[in-house]
From Swiss-Prot:
GO biological process, one term: cytoplasmic translation
Organism the protein comes from: Epinephelus coioides
Function: Component of the large ribosomal subunit. The ribosome is a large ribonucleoprotein complex responsible for the synthesis of proteins in the cell.
Protein name: Large ribosomal subunit protein eL15
Keyword line: Cytoplasm, Ribonucleoprotein, Ribosomal protein
GO function terms (MF aspect): RNA binding; structural constituent of ribosome
Domain of life: Eukaryota
UniProt gene name: rpl15
One cellular-component annotation, GO: cytosolic large ribosomal subunit
Length: 204
């Protein structure tokens, strides 16, 4: 096994003494820093490389801190102005994951960069910490490489805002495996529409 394989196995056993100590110390360190800051290098190089990171010019890693828990509806004094069925304020669950939120915040802060992917690096009772891989699409090392030219196209601007990253697709119900089999037709809305539309073919 290569070195990255050993690192992968370490991260799989998060309850081991080594990882429990490491994660505890790192969470303390991350709490002292601002909620969005640039990391000098990936905390998990094995995971970052699997998600497309390369240790060369044009790649940047940002660490983002996101507060855990549900989403409270931002209304003044709980006044939602509507029918009682929509009066909920506190027990609201956000449609997207905290990882997707972290990607959005990093993409908003670094407007000239493109969000490639992200991964979990730690959590405590209050926060979750993610590292977001961003790409500088104006750098020659990215533009001249056939493997990374795809992200330089204008259609990939702010992919994190439109649910095109891995974390974003997950909350849209898109992916492979038994969890995503029901989303057939490109989106949940398309799947629902097809199931609820009566089609009477001429020859049936």
């Amino acid at each position: 096994m290569g070195a990255y394989r050993y690192m992968q196995e370490l991260w799989r056993k998060k309850q081991s003494d080594v990882m429990r100590f490491l994660l505890r110390v790192r969470c303390w360190q991350y709490r002292q820093l601002s909620n969005l800051h640039r990391a000098p290098r990936p905390t998990r190089p094995d995971k970052a490389r699997r998600l497309g990171y390369k240790a060369k010019q044009g790649y940047v890693v940002y660490r983002v801190r996101v507060r855990r828990g549900g989403r409270k509806r931002p209304v003044p004094k709980g006044a939602t102005y509507g029918k009682p069925v929509h009066h909920g304020v506190n027990q609201i669950k956000f449609a997207r994951s905290l990882q997707s939120t972290a990607e959005e915040r990093a993409g908003r802060h670094c407007g000239a960069l493109r969000v490639l992917n992200s991964y979990w690096v730690g959590e405590d009772s209050t926060y979750k910490f993610f590292e977001v891989i961003l790409v500088d699409t104006f750098h020659k090392a990215i533009r001249r490489n056939p493997d990374t030219q795809w992200i330089t196209k204008a259609v990939h601007k702010h992919r994190e805002m439109r649910g095109l990253t891995s974390a974003g697709k997950k909350s849209r119900g898109l992916g492979k495996g038994h969890k995503f089999h029901l989303t057939i037709g490109g989106s949940r809305r398309a799947a629902w529409k097809r199931r609820n539309t009566l089609q009477l073919h001429r020859y049936r």
